[in-house]
Amino acid sequence: MVDQRHIRNFCIIAHIDHGKSTLADRLIEFTGVLTKREMTDQVLDNMELERERGITIKAQSVRMDYVADDGEQYVLNLIDTPGHVDFTYEVSRALAACEGALLVVDASQGIEAQTLANVYMALEHDLEIIPVINKIDLPAADPEKVKKEIEEVIGLDTSIAILASAKTGIGMKEILEAVVNFVPPPKGDRRAPLRALIYDSFYDSYKGVITYFRIFEGTVRKGDRIRFMATGKEFIVDELYIFRPGLTPVEELTAGEVGALAATIREVKHVRVGDTITLADNPAAEPLPGYRKATPMVFTGLYPVETNDYGRLRDALEKLQLNDASLSFEPETSEALGFGFRCGFLGLLHMDVIQERLEREFDLNLITTAPNVVYRVNMTSGEQIMIENPANWPDPSKIESVEEPVVRASIITPTEYVGPLMELCQDRRGTFLNMEYLNEKRVNLHYKLPLAEIMYDFFDQLKTRSRGYASFDYEVTGYEPSDMVKMDILVHGQPVDALSCIVHREKAQKLGRALVQKLRKLIPRHLFEVPIQAAVGNKILARENIAPLRKDVLAKCYGGDVTRKRKLLEKQKEGKKRMKAVGSVEIPQEAFMAVLSTDPDED
């Protein structure tokens, strides 16, 4: 049993690319958890996709033994956190499991938007924050400027800031000493009823769901009967583990320690991030605070290109759901695309990652429909309904008002790009809140934006207009009334359900025109004329025609009588008329993708 005074639980907070995973690698190597031979880059990012994109998606952990300068041996638990805004709830639970945090800032870049968001979250959890200025080996590094920025923007004392380079290994000992000296040891009575916070879980095909947790009070042993307080489910602990990146079995874990357990749990939905574990025969009176169910913010339809793959897609989604309880899906059918699923995600990166994993790990070809946010529709009858699929949009005459989700966005950018970025936010129906100067060269802009407007290519536009220098972070703040309408696309007079989208009334005309022009280029020509129309209700906003292909029926007439020619042309016209009445139009897959990339400013 480890003396509580010798345990330190900490995490690393950093913006993407500021060197968080590399720093974790160096600390693991420095404390000798893994030998040089066993080390791989980014030990804690085990998903191929995480390494490739350089992002951490699932929180991982490692336990390190370290003999400090005072001669005592300490147990340091590093809990790796995802840094991206979509996974904010996972970050908040991982932070709740710690007492301290290393704030890693790139010496050449300074503070970025996501760093700020996570620092404020760490301060809310009363964590002791140790600033680490990383990448000091870079020629462009300016540690003094970054120190000043940290002091001015966040208000942290940087006299204890550590200069480090995770790449070359400079400053690792200083970081570990700072963790021992500044991060407070965990508190908590080992004899009290068990209360442990779940901060992650993953599915193992042999052992079932493996639950990662941090114990706040009490003790858990192998063979105990445990209860999850949010779901009320009970299980018997088969095995307990600590992390030496891999799972290493132990007999018991007590207050202050971080570990994992296997209890033959078959479904990940029983294990919810943020829930409290207690003992069934001696339960705690109150769960730990802060648990909430993950609510999907973005919905999209996923359809297999080959209809026979429907079963495989369902199995793949079920497998992914085992590791990711925030993914929700239900079957849906579309006239244009056949059978598929309506999936809910935490945000756009989450959607992107899941889609890429489906295509890569399960070898599926997918068509995605345009992503939608959840609208709140107040009906004239007084009831309120939530709509995430344009197909379920009610009859306009029965709608009293519509509310859409809005976010508070924070954009950190060099001063010379403020103009183009403000213009971008105005275009996206943004409301300017305020702006603050971080130093003479960088500004933090605050905007209120509709979530639907940052869904498609806002991030790409942001990077384009700031030449890649701006960083962006947002939090959903609630719902606000908005004038939203459903826009249908009619091809050959028939509405195509998969192309319908919900847009703001003011933008409907512009978007409708851009969309029909795009579809005109993508839908192949037929033997009869095909009109493409964008409509809101009964009003047609834009129309384009696809000209028909025609056979030259006069080719064999040479000279000949004009009446003969006329007869052949009339006959052709009759045939076209009949064809137009019964013909069906092929819509290629690219046409569905066009909805995703329609930017009215392109043409």
Swiss-Prot record:
**Coiled-coil ranges per UniProt:** none
Localization, per the record, is:
Cell membrane
Disulfide bond residue pairs: none
CDD domains the UniProt entry points to: EF4_II (cd03699), EF4_III (cd16260), LepA (cd01890), lepA_C (cd03709)
Assigned EC number = 3.6.5.n1
Where's the tr-type G domain? 5-187
Catalytic activity reported = GTP + H2O = GDP + phosphate + H(+)
Q: Which SUPFAM superfamilies is this protein grouped with?
A: EF-G C-terminal domain-like, P-loop containing nucleoside triphosphate hydrolases, Translation proteins
Tell me the domain of life.
Bacteria
Q: Which GO terms describe its molecular function?
A: GTP binding; GTPase activity; ribosome binding; translation elongation factor activity
Q: What is this protein called?
A: Elongation factor 4
Protein species of origin: Symbiobacterium thermophilum (strain DSM 24528 / JCM 14929 / IAM 14863 / T)
